[in-house]
């Protein structure tokens, strides 16, 4: 099945609803993907890219239903990766002499994958053109390391369509092809996820390359990507976002992620987040347990954040393996303009937090002081965690924060509280958190002045998330 893109340009690609892993298992494609191939029929017939190798036979069969394969005059390969050029072997078996236009680096990559040096390769460079008839040309622009050395884009004059390769794409599968037809929230979430996890290491190249392309002074009516939607409605909006994301992007956001063996490091993470929120309630704080969270969502949040707090238990004197792996990925992504702090719990010996701090610094983060706790944090240790969060909130603030002062209740209010018999304070037997009836627990809609007997049965301890049955009367108040 083909879809009309514009005039004599048709999409002849392949949707992949089921794919959930990309680049091995390193990128989770939770919304599937598509492999976009385009057929141009002017006086010359041109095929731009193919599809993933697992769809090779299906792709060639579908293409044959659109055009006699022998009538294809040129094949353009913007990128040699297997999800772009994977069907070349199947296709070239039918039309072995058809010229393949690509960069010099692409020849090496294509031969490395397909092992056919006898194919009719034509090397192109930035500014080279190919006449396709009817007064139209293809103009080639090399884009090395966006995101492979062989990458290039192809611009079609007349119709003003930029075939942008991986740039401006997203792993997003939908029955509809164009950006104005799909769910906008989903689309832009996947665009940012794609940039954060794939293109971030090359951000320093994005702005000059976009500037170079704009320097050709060519109109762009559509951007036809290699994955996801074709941008036809205000196509330059995604270009503007790329320029923004490439400029050491950050939001007023802090990401906390951790791994834990006995919930101790999780308790620290929660307390740190509480401290941040006390001082700066406007900053967005997201907490992830790496053992239970989508790794690419965590990395996307790190990309969006001004800073990250990373927590780990100590195991065999080193950090937890999932934390080590994720920090290694952050090193490769080369995030810029971000701060970091390490924290974690240990038992008879430590080592993980110091090792983690060193790794984060090596990854390019500006480091703040780390925080350690021995065994399960008690009330004093949890208060130190909250104070650490307060300190971090002030150190990482994008603008000066107002000083907070402890509000003193009016005398008559104090008298009323003392006079009222609210019952004893209750202490969680697992994490030692204390419920004070005078303060309640506003985050769970338990108002100040609520005795324990009136607290709803679905109440959960804010520190360890266990229910009311693990609470006992505070020892100092037990009679």
Curated annotation (Swiss-Prot):
Entry-linked Pfam families:
Flavodoxin_1, ODP, Rubredoxin
UniProt organism field: Salmonella choleraesuis (strain SC-B67)
Rubredoxin-like domain boundaries? 423-474
| Alphabetical list of Gene3D superfamilies matching this protein | 2.20.28.10, 3.40.50.360, Ribonuclease Z/Hydroxyacylglutathione hydrolase-like
Organism lineage string = Bacteria, Pseudomonadati, Pseudomonadota, Gammaproteobacteria, Enterobacterales
Q: Binding residues for FMN, per the UniProt record?
A: 260-264, 342-369
Pathway(s) per entry:
Nitrogen metabolism; nitric oxide reduction
Q: Does the keyword Zinc apply?
A: no
Subunit structure as annotated in this protein's UniProt entry: Homotetramer.
Ranges for the region named Zinc metallo-hydrolase are 30-210
- The stretch of residues making up the signal peptide is none
Q: Which residues form the Flavodoxin-like domain?
A: 254-393
Q: What is the name of the gene encoding this protein?
A: norV
Give the cofactors, semicolon-separated: Fe cation; FMN
Name of the protein: Anaerobic nitric oxide reductase flavorubredoxin
- Residues annotated as transmembrane: none
